Amino acid sequence: MAVFTAVSNADLALWMRHYDLGDVVAFRGIPSGIENSNFFLTTTRGEYVLTIFENLTAGQLPFYVDLMSHLAKHGVPVPAPVARDDGTLFGELHGKPAAIVTKLEGAAQLAPGVEHCVEVGQMLARMHLAGRDYPRHQPNLRSLPWWRDTVPAIAPFVTGEQRALLEGELAHQAAFFASDDYAALPEGPCHCDLFRDNALFAHAEPDTGHSVRLGGFFDFYFAGCDKWLFDVAVTVNDWCVDLPTGALDAARADALLRAYQTVRPFTAGERRHWGDMLRAGAYRFWVSRLYDFHLPRAAQMLKPHDPGHFERILRERIAHAGALPETHACN
């Protein structure tokens, strides 16, 4: 989340006339992230987040806001879009689509432990199952077609060794995506960006036996229909990584994956291709971070991420694929 489009007090006052949310108490931009303009909004009715969509069109947006509504109605803790006075879930601000959603409880855990990974794994599986009957379809817009379009644009900015890795991994993933095994993998709506800063944790209730409690997942604006295993791989590559080296932390990865499969057991095909999908998850973010770093957009509060982090992760996943835990295997 970042701020590309500024919103004045006068802009906000006009915008809020379309909502029954009381009077504005506080309003400030959110500096983290790189895709949309985001603001914390506090009113006399509660706390919310206002998002102005910098790339998604009004035609694309219903997939995302309706998905959050669908998941919230199925008991998954996600931000719920707030309806406007005409019943719609988004409008237009400065000529761009914009929406208000509820603000989740809790704070991000940027140094997660095993207990946090257990909570994330279980809820990710619940989210996947809750999305099975979601009627809209939107492909993951940062998948293979986007990689093919983007790699030539970033190639002039990287070393020869990096270019060889970019092109070699693209060929590997293209062959994987074209396989019958890939086609058979379970799929549905995915978050596609479930990093540790896109989940919140609140204090656990007394006498529950839990040391932490997941407040919820947010920032669904990279979501799309994809293989569930890709969503798991993206999540593991962030929540279970040793930051200096990019290697997987075995204890955290095992905890997250075992927790996930207590809700949705992995298939035999998913087990065969776990290594390929870990590489796909790392590749997707290496490519996007290279693009954002070398071809940045103007923003008031933009903080680009280090592309080298996911280059290290990709090299580690190629060298050490790992395996899914064997408990609760199914065919």
From Swiss-Prot:
Pathway: Amino-acid biosynthesis; L-threonine biosynthesis; L-threonine from L-aspartate: step 4/5. Its EC number is 2.7.1.39. It catalyses: L-homoserine + ATP = O-phospho-L-homoserine + ADP + H(+). Keywords: Amino-acid biosynthesis, ATP-binding, Kinase, Nucleotide-binding, Threonine biosynthesis, Transferase. The keyword Endoplasmic reticulum does not apply. InterPro entries: Aminoglycoside_PTrfase, Homoserine_kinase_II, Kinase-like_dom_sf, Pseudomonas-type_ThrB. It is an enzyme of class 2 (transferase). GO terms for molecular function: ATP binding; homoserine kinase activity. One of its GO terms (biological process) is threonine biosynthetic process. CDD domains: HomoserineK_II (cd05153). The keyword Coiled coil does not apply. Belongs to the pseudomonas-type ThrB family. HAMAP family: Homoser_kinase_2. This is Homoserine kinase. The lineage of its organism: Bacteria, Pseudomonadati, Pseudomonadota, Betaproteobacteria, Burkholderiales. The gene is thrB.
